[in-house]
Every structure is written in C-alpha cells, then in structure tokens.
Amino acid sequence: MRQENSSRLTKWREPLPTELRSASVVLSERDLSTTMPVPLHGRCDQVFDNGRFLYVVDTKRRKKPAVYLRDVIQLSVYRVILERESQRLIGYHRSVSPTGYVRVTGYGTTSYLQVKLLTTTQVVALWNRYWELKTRKAAANPRVAVVQVCSACDQAPRCPRYQY
C-alpha cells in the first residue's frame, strides 16, 4: 500500500517554471518580518532556492490565471524582507530574484505566472504613502472612483473623486 501511495505522489507534477525545477523549497508558510528599511511583515507561501537566487511564490485560488497589483506588492514586500533577513530565516544569505511567481490554482489547473517585483525604493515609497494617508497628512487622489473600493475607504469624505 505504501508503494502504491508513493508512486501516485511521484506521478503528480505541476508545470514548474524553469528557474524552480531544480530548486529546493527553503521556506513554506512562514511568517517574515523586518524593521529595516521600514517595518514590514507577511506570511510567505513558498521561497525556493535554485543555488543562484531565492524566488518568492504566493498561491492564489482564482477562476482565471491573473496577476493583480496587490500580488506584485505582496511578493515585493517578501523580497525586501528576504534581502535583509535571509541569514536569520534560512541560515545563509542569498540574493532574491527580481522576479517572483504567483501560483494560480483553480478548476483542476495550476499556473505559475512570473511577475517583475518592485524595488526596495518603490516598496518604501508605498509604505510612506500608506502612512501619509493613514495619518491624514495627505489626501487620497485616485484617478478613478471605484464604488467597491471607495465605499470602504476612510478617505472618501475628503476625496475629490468620491461622490456617492
């Protein structure tokens, strides 16, 4: 019975990207954090090491394979944390790839979608903007008002685009 189960497992494969085929998973479902360059934290689904770079991977369950800006930001935050904290988290320092992957599962299929990650400077700029809005030192100024987003925003009463 044991051999039967293990043979079924060895036949199951996902269409891994080239960079990940020979890589090892060094972190899985792990909380990550850093205080530098700004305080950041998150829970990364997987981090792969192919001997040259660390690759961040986050799994999303979706009807269609798609990447959203929030996915890129999330993976980029993990990249910034790992650049600073890989020694502490995995026991050695390794550069983090400027690309990551969104692993999209749904309806019996799995796809790995490559994304270009934001730089540390861009992540810090987003962090600063978030806190400017949160502490009301800046006003929101979206290009377009989106009802689903704007109705939950605490900046809506002061926003020039929100008129619902």
Report the location of each language-model feature.
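A structure-centric signal for secondary-structure junctions around beta-strands
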Residues: R43, G51-F53, V72, S97, ...
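Metal-dependent nuclease catalytic regions and adjoining charged, substrate-binding loops involved
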Residues: A23-H41, R84-Y164
